[in-house]
């Protein structure tokens, strides 16, 4: 009888232990669920993705662009010969006095499938996309929807930092925010910007120039917040569609997939494909694909005052060393003494633009290399454009 009582007590203790263990496990799971970092939550389609899916439901691939090249023009013949002899792998577009004079592909868009680069090949423009973000920002300024001197926290109240960050400092890359570290865990722009806010400011870099993708990701989020529209929708409704940039698309737009160049780099075993696996978080700073002709078309139309009035356009394109534009860099591009320049490099692709009032030269490659050497030779030595263009300290009307 005594043995049975002991047995019952043991069974009861075991049962109680099991119940308590189950309760503790359940509590831990509940706590873990509620304490998941919002940066790493599972997400559905982002606003950008939703907009692009809807936009492309009935969209077909754009019409093909023809090759433009006049072998009877000595300078363009020389450019063509130079690109071939230097084993250039990419595409070139050159506008002269507002007209397309050269558009040609070299090498391969996709080495594995043997698909050649053509005027239709669209390249990942990387940081050259900051130019588009800068244009959207400038438009919102002119519409009096933002003040470039306001702190970012005015537009994103949750973006709290140890020191105030004006939008202007983001635009000029002098916010002091720690350099953005991309992660495969971030699945959209929101998660990227929350990660940027969480890392905060490096006090040693505050108010000092430090190029940082994070600055333009935050600006992209500000643009979304102010307009109530996704970055992609802002781009298309305010730039892409009005200026008829039909050979430009975001990285995940299905109708354009067959035209997107693959990026490569040489390593010890030969040519290696660099898979762009973090573009979902790069709205505003590096997930746009363009043909060189579309970029040239964009710049030409800005020069022709189709986006801003002369009063806005001329200082924007030409001033530096002035109160309004103290630095060469502004709104995603550089105004330098002999030219204006924008550039981006991402996942083996490099997209570079040199331009003045006479020429717009766009050179895009998809095998990682020094694009600057080639475009300098074309612009300075063949087209003979190494001469004064913008003057420091001069206010332009």
Swiss-Prot record:
Catalytic activity: [(4-D-Ala)-(2-GlcNAc)-Rib-ol-P]n-[Gro-P]m-beta-D-ManNAc-(1->4)-alpha-D-GlcNAc-P-peptidoglycan + n H2O = [(2-GlcNAc)-Rib-ol-P]n-[Gro-P]m-beta-D-ManNAc-(1->4)-alpha-D-GlcNAc-P-peptidoglycan + n D-alanine
GO cellular component: plasma membrane
A GO BP annotation: cell wall organization
Induction: Transcription is dose dependently increased by the addition of beta-lactam antibiotics, fosfomycin, and bacitracin.
Signal peptide: 1-23
EC number: 3.1.1.103
Keyword annotations from UniProtKB, A to Z: Antibiotic resistance, Cell membrane, Cell wall biogenesis/degradation, Hydrolase, Membrane, Signal
Job description of the protein: Catalyzes the liberation of D-alanyl moieties present on wall teichoic acid (WTA) and lipoteichoic acid (LTA). Affects the methicillin resistance level and autolysis in the presence of Triton X-100 as well as the cell wall structure.
Protein name, entry field: Teichoic acid D-alanine hydrolase
Organism annotation: Staphylococcus aureus
Lineage: Bacteria, Bacillati, Bacillota, Bacilli, Bacillales
Gene: fmtA
